[in-house]
């Protein structure tokens, strides 16, 4: 099996996409996930992070997008990535019935990648628990901030 070592992982919400307009729905003790996802279509791209993804791709990195979004949001996610002219090697998303914490879902995605011959070296994320997981797994992780836990 071919081993891909030049792999970079990018998160979507808060990383590739600016979600400041809808973050308010999940920052209190009573989280309103329905509204949080309902306003996803109004997200805007983060030029700085898209630029980084394009630069890494131009330098020979395989780009894989790992999102905590559910599969039911795949079409809008693909549309948002296309708007930013990003064509990842893969877009990994959680199952619609998966309610585990993001860091658990993404750790499983990482295991799947490694089992498939991909050995990511870089991750870009905004959620502290996920940033910690990437780093614990040996990846260099760029924390683009914005999320508090």
Model-derived segments and spans:
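Short, aromatic/basic amphipathic alpha-helical patches
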Residues: 77-84, 113, 133-138
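Acidic, Mg2+-coordinating phosphoryl-transfer loop and its flanking beta/alpha structural elements
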Residues: 110, 118-149
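Short loop-to-alpha-helix "cap/lid" segments that border enzyme active sites
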Residues: 101-113
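Short, solvent-exposed polar/charged micro-motifs at secondary-structure junctions
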Residues: 75, 100-104, 131-133
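Glycine-rich phosphate-binding loop signature in dinucleotide/nucleotide-binding domains
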Residues: 2-3, 59, 113-120
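Surface-exposed amphipathic alpha-helices with a cationic face
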Residues: 53-57, 111-114, 135
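Alpha-helical substrate-recognition element adjacent to the catalytic core
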Residues: 2-100
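Amphipathic coiled-coil/heptad-repeat helices and related helical stalk/stem segments
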Residues: 48-49, 103-106, 127
